[in-house]
A protein has these predicted regions:
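Gly/Pro-enriched, hydrophobic low-complexity segments
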Residues: 254-257, 318-415
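Signal peptide processing junction and immediate N-terminal pro/mature segment
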Residues: 24-52, 56-69
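Acidic/charged, solvent-exposed loop-and-adjacent secondary-structure segments enriched in E/D, K/R, S/T
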Residues: 270-297
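Mature N-terminal segment immediately following signal peptide/propeptide cleavage
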Residues: 77-114, 118, 198-225
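N-terminal mature ectodomain segment of secretory-pathway/periplasmic proteins
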Residues: 203-276, 306-313
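N-terminal secretory signal peptides that target proteins for export/translocation
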Residues: 1-11
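The canonical Cys-X-X-Cys-His
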Residues: 113-123, 154-164
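Primarily the internal scaffold of c-type cytochrome electron-transfer domains
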Residues: 66-67, 71, 75-77, 85, ...
Length: 417
């Protein structure tokens, strides 16, 4: 996943900013200042001075009914903390879960190649000129989608900005005649003529990792290694706990406090010392994504995890041919999976979560497969979202060990160090 050069320069100029981006919400949220991070870690569920740009939903017919319509359109689950409960000065994006709110912030950051404080004041509540302009742009995007696409999120910030603060008007000829830039399609696709049958690709994958019988005998594993955050410079210890068929917990012991990502088979959470909500409930597409991540850890049930499987024509990643499959989760969110044509192993997953301003992508690239109890397990993967990336490298994996049920329970709020 390519990150804008301006954004990279900002990150690598200081280890603090690099760390904050690295521990941004797995939902795709933006980073935050140390002042705001410390306040959120001690304030529990009290409102914090975040005051981020408050975008409207693309399919929303008007701003006056913003709160009620947001809840109705997203089917916001009961009991989860909403954006206006967590943050101050939320003017538009009310009635939606915090993880969707943060995913939308991440989309703004990715589209403009900007970090938080390039739009926000240090206290995050003030209406800066860029925030005011952004609200006008949101209304413009909503009008375009409502007028031309029946409210569907066809046009987004990324459509025009592409990591620039101002959309280009005139095509530069050195770009027109230069090396073409390939943008992977993020739309749903149908079964392509001439593409392999999805079951054929999935069966080869199951066989490549060791076969159904060996997968059934691998009931759990515990991995240990290191995690490198976006920007580099240091590595943090990491622990991964997996229990078949669909429980997974990852703990990254970061310098300023642990980050814990857990899926217990039904619900998912993120706990971090430097996020605006100490323990974030995963909802919607982010919950579907956490479920897929857990199932892929011991992938014996992959065919059943996603439905409506279809195959596109083969593509390539890093010079290797890959088969491209797409499936849809029960919640309606989709994921695209890339399998190495020669080995049959899973190379990449790109999964999507709907948000107020479009789909929030999460990309996981797998490598360094090694046998664990007869099953090939990736010992290296990168986990990238719209405002950060972790690269995890395992040094040891212990198979079929007893794991306490508490490892998959809702994590306690992280304690800042």
């Amino acid at each position: 996943m390519q990150i804008g050069s301006k954004r990279m320069r900002l990150v690598v100029t200081g280890a603090t900013i690099a760390w904050l981006i690295g521990v941004a919400l797995v939902a795709g949220g933006t980073g935050m200042s140390i002042r705001a991070a410390a306040a959120s870690a001690t304030a529990s569920n009290k409102k914090v001075g975040w005051g981020a740009v408050q975008p409207a939903r693309c399919d929303r017919p008007g701003f006056a009914q913003a709160g009620a319509q947001a809840a109705a359109q997203t089917g916001a689950p009961q009991g989860h903390q909403m954006s206006e409960e967590a943050f101050k000065n939320v003017q538009v994006l009310k009635g939606i879960p915090v993880d969707e709110f943060m995913g939308t912030m991440g989309l703004f950051s990715a589209a403009l190649s900007m970090c938080c404080l390039e739009c926000h004041a240090p206290d995050y509540t003030a209406d800066t000129p860029r925030k005011v302009t952004t609200r006008r742009m949101i209304e413009m995007v909503n009008t375009i989608n409502r007028t031309n696409f029946s409210g569907r999120k066809v046009v987004s910030c990324w459509t025009c900005h592409r990591q620039m603060d101002r959309p280009a008007v005139t095509p530069p000829l050195d770009v027109v005649y230069g090396e073409p830039t390939y943008w992977a399609p993020d739309d749903l696709f149908q079964q392509a003529k001439g593409a392999p049958a999805p079951n054929q690709v999935l069966d080869k994958y199951i066989q490549a990792v060791g076969g159904a019988e060996r997968l059934a005998r691998l009931t759990s594993f515990v991995g240990k290694g290191t995690a490198s955050l976006f920007g580099g410079g240091f590595k943090s210890p990491v622990e991964v706990y997996v229990k078949a068929p669909n429980q997974r917990t990852t703990i990254i012991h970061q310098e300023l406090g642990d980050k814990t990502m857990t899926f217990d088979g039904r619900a998912g959470w993120l706990a971090s010392a430097v996020t605006p909500v100490p323990v974030l409930d995963l909802t919607g597409g982010e919950l579907d994504g956490a479920r897929l991540d857990a199932e892929l850890s011991i992938p014996g049930r992959l065919k059943q995890v996603l439905g409506q499987w279809r195959a596109n024509l083969p593509s390539s990643i890093a010079g290797r041919d890959v088969n491209v499959l797409q499936g849809t989760a029960a919640g309606g969110n989709h994921a695209t999976l890339y399998f190495d044509v020669e080995s049959g192993l899973l190379t990449r997953v790109v999964r999507y979560a709907n948000s107020a301003m479009g789909r929030v992508p999460t990309q996981i690239d797998f490598g360094d497969y090694r046998e664990v109890a007869g099953v090939k397990v990736p010992f290296r993967w990168s986990f990238a979202w719209v405002s950060g990336r972790d690269v995890i490298e395992l040094s040891e994996v212990q198979p079929n060990v007893a794991i306490a049920a508490t490892r998959f329970a809702k994590p306690a709020p992280a304690i800042p160090r």
